[in-house]
A protein has these predicted regions:
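Loop/turn positions that initiate beta-strands
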Residues: 18-20
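A short acidic, amphipathic alpha-helical/loop segment
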Residues: 233-240, 259-262
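Domain-level recognition of nuclease-like catalytic cores that cleave nucleotide substrates
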Residues: 31, 36-43, 253-304
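Short peripheral tails and domain-boundary helices/loops at the edges of structured domains
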Residues: 40-83
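Acidic-basic catalytic patches of nuclease active cores, encompassing PD-(D/E)XK
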Residues: 148-196
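Single conserved hydrophobic/aromatic residue that forms the stacking wall/gate
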Residues: 1-4, 8, 12
């Protein structure tokens, strides 16, 4: 290790160090260490190891965040190393992502106190996990290249179809975990009239089909990662609730004013993580429910 004074002289006076990465770390109250990484390979390895993008240099690094993200990558690689199949089932993938996120970042209390943040955190971890598995399974094949256009298309279709399938189920799995953590009673993929299947019926499928059960105590929720065009599917998923609000949880950031007006006319209420609501038309944001508000509403209706 070089002294701070020597490092400063080297970085300022020697042109060969222009563009080098200077890393200055605090060891304790009195001692510091400084490093100069001058090759692209060394710089890339450092940034990759700590999950730092090139745009995040020239500033203080949150050591706690770096440590957590490094732990997350290690946990993901350990999970992949233990797999006995190419890709786990969607439910297993989501559960693994929640387990990794909960272990690394903690804050299990957010399931109750801040479900809006928790569901985004789980979703982000699952996305990172899925990408890591894709890289482990397909990285070498892609690096080698393809012998024909057909071979490339076959690979691309396989990857895209798996991505679509995972994304469609991921939100449902994480919502189930939020509901379980809040002791909410529900049936996932309940069967209603004409074999229709809303994603969630509260409190249960049995209650829905019990004509003596009060309609005002029934709630339906659809889960769609994106809903720009498919939101109309939720309108007729439960005949008993045709004149009641239909709730639609989505991770889509932003919908046009015209579509929001159409949703309102069909009595569809959007449920969106709080962090995403600002991406919606400002004069219509008051129509949107946060996930926290929806959870509180269901708990109230169920008398919890």
């Amino acid at each position: 290790h070089l002294s701070i004074r020597r490092q400063r002289q080297m970085c300022i006076r020697d042109r060969e160090y222009t563009g080098a990465l200077f890393v200055f770390t605090k060891c304790d109250a009195e001692d510091y260490q400084a490093f100069v990484l001058n090759s692209e390979e060394d710089i890339d390895q450092f940034l990759d190891a700590f999950g730092i993008s090139p745009t995040e240099t020239n500033q203080l690094i949150d050591a706690g965040r770096v440590q957590e993200e490094t732990q997350e990558r290690i946990a993901i690689q350990e999970f992949i190393a233990g797999l006995t199949v190419d890709f786990p089932l969607s439910e297993e993938m989501s559960a693994a992502a929640r387990d990794i996120q909960n272990r690394v970042y903690d804050h299990l209390e957010f399931i109750r106190t801040n479900p809006d943040r928790k569901i985004i955190d789980w979703t982000n971890t699952e996305y990172a996990l899925f990408r890591a598995i894709e890289h482990a399974r397909y990285g070498d094949a892609i690096a080698r290249g393809f012998t024909s256009v057909d071979e490339f298309i076959t690979m691309a279709n396989m990857v895209l179809n798996r991505r679509k399938s995972r994304a469609g189920k991921s939100l449902e799995h994480h919502l189930s975990a939020i509901f379980d953590g809040n002791e909410i009673i529900y049936t996932a993929q309940a069967v209603t009239e004409g074999n229709k299947k809303p994603d969630f019926i509260f409190p249960s499928q049995a209650s829905y089909h019990d004509m003596t059960f009060p309609t005002e105590r029934l709630i339906s929720l659809a889960a769609k990662t994106t809903c720009k065009d498919r939101w109309r599917q939720v309108i007729n998923e439960a005949d008993r609730l045709r004149d009641r609000p239909k709730y639609l949880c989505t991770l889509q950031q932003g919908i046009s004013p015209a579509q929001m007006d159409e949703m309102q006319s069909e009595n569809v209420i959007l449920v969106v993580p709080r962090q995403y609501i600002t991406s919606y038309p400002a004069d219509r944001q008051d129509r949107i429910w946060t996930l926290s508000k929806f959870v509180s509403y269901v708990r109230e209706v169920e008398g919890l």
